[in-house]
Amino acid sequence: MHDLKWSKSEKKLARNVFNACLQVELVEMVNTFKSRAAAATTADDVWAMEEFLTQKRREIDGKYDFRYSQLLVVFGRLVREGRLREDELHGFSSDKQSFILRIASL
């Protein structure tokens, strides 16, 4: 199922959806960091921020994989997490939408 062919319009939509979801997650991470930094009063608070950033980087790098062979799984996960809505999948083939929604339901 991962070897489905991607049309030119699907590739463009995939890139736009991927970038939009990634950008939202990065903005959330930056805002959380700013809040924690503003509240930091001890060295332990600073080290905790470093741990937070390291963990978020691993999480985001592992989640956002723009290989076409992985995108359906990536989008399924984003739907499951509430970062991508089902109506944002319109424009992908029905096979791709079905696969994404199956992944989201796991």
Identify the function of each model-found stretch.
Residues M1-L106:
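Acidic, Ser/Pro/Thr-rich low-complexity regulatory regions
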